[in-house]
Amino acid sequence: MEKVYVAGAIPEVGLKLLQEHFEVEMYEGKGLVDKDTLIKGVKNATALISLLSTNVDKDVIDAGKDLKIIANYGAGFNNIDIEYAREKSIDVTNTPKASTNATADLTIGLVLAVARRIVEGDQLSRTTGFDGWAPLFFRGREVSGKTIGIIGLGEIGSAVARRARAFDMDVLYTGPNRKEEKEREIGAKYVDLDTLLKNADFITINAAYNPKMHHLIDTEQFKMMKSTVYLINASRGPIVHEQALVQALKDNEIEGAALDVYEFEPDITDDLKSLNNVVLTPHIGNATFEARDMMSKIVANAAISAVQGEKPQFVVN
């Protein structure tokens, strides 16, 4: 029986599938798998199930001389050297569609949380309390009727747009390609990045990360935004220059931010933790029972397909 190495615990539905077709070795230690353990694990393995937090670099790929597939448990894949994997004729797959609804739900949840100061209000209610209802007390911003600017109208961005339309929001989007069919379906308008930054009341980042996207949102971009804008990032941390974001918040150049991802993840900049107009969540975009179960089935089936000589779904290289 061929071996699969699983770089961390995954839901049982996927693990059982793997156990039916492979000798399964899984990292069960505390925290993230370290490089030496990963290199040891991929030796003699035909398939690797990697997590978003698993750094699969050239050294790891070279150690996995028998690898046919690296099935990444997540929609993103910037944790893997996909070009080098291609050179080695190793398929790399991801789990794109499984994350769509969960991540879109969280994105809109972050919009509401930061605009209506929900987390801040929860903390107040649990600590000092409040003196009762008052006309000027704890005001936030309404979402309905505002303009949302979506960076990246892929599967997740489109799902965010549909939810935003249910709030009677006007939808702007930007990306490398115009998507006229989706524009008609959703009621979205394509604009360039600068126009989106200048006109949106809420900016959500839902684009996939690649090196060209690094620090797409930096000091110059913050200066283009409305002073009342909220920035929401549920994609990848390095798309936003985190120190520039901190400065924009401190200088009141923008009204608030809600982040599920971080530039130096899992580390979170201390300044972000100290600001009341920032909502922080621990990279839980697709952290639902439904999504995570589906993701585990997708990676398991991809690995099974690869060892059976079939082309797996969702190859990214």
From Swiss-Prot:
EC number: 1.1.1.-
Keyword terms, alphabetized: NAD, Oxidoreductase
GO molecular function list: NAD binding; oxidoreductase activity, acting on the CH-OH group of donors, NAD or NADP as acceptor
Ion transport among keywords: no
UniProt entry tagged with the keyword Oxidoreductase: yes
Gene3D superfamilies: NAD(P)-binding Rossmann-like Domain
Entry's transmembrane regions: none
Cystine pairs: none
Record: residues binding NAD(+): E155, I156, A234, S235, R236, D260, H283, I284, G285, N286
Catalytic residues (positions): R236, E265, H283
Pfam families xref list: 2-Hacid_dh, 2-Hacid_dh_C
Class of the enzyme per the UniProt entry, highest EC level: oxidoreductase
Family: Belongs to the D-isomer specific 2-hydroxyacid dehydrogenase family.
PANTHER family: D-ISOMER SPECIFIC 2-HYDROXYACID DEHYDROGENASE FAMILY PROTEIN (AFU_ORTHOLOGUE AFUA_6G10090)
Record-given protein name: Putative 2-hydroxyacid dehydrogenase SA2098
